[in-house]
Amino acid sequence: RSVRQHDGDDDLVGVPGWSIEAKRYKAAPPALVAQWWGQAVEQSRRTNALPVLFYRADRADWRVVWPAGLHQSPRPQPLPPGFVDTLTGDPLTWWRMVRGLAPS
């Protein structure tokens, strides 16, 4: 986990090309997840990286949100920023789906 928790900083570092936002809350209703996604997108624009959101609610598994456009060919430029244009899965599924993607 990143030591610096200032606005605009990535929460986690070490995955090149990705701007990682991480949230841990009591509950994670869809409206709140959509708000967090907006934060992830804004942060990724500042760092010139792809946005990804990791979140977990109490007594729930970790979930990951990332842009669906990454899996389209040709890839939309820029990627649509809306929450409706995302995929959600567990961390292993995210990694399996994106590990071979080029960051462009």
Question: Which residues does each predicted region cover?
Answer:
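Catalytic phosphate/metal-binding cores of nucleic-acid and nucleotide-processing enzymes, i.e., regions
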Residues: 1-104
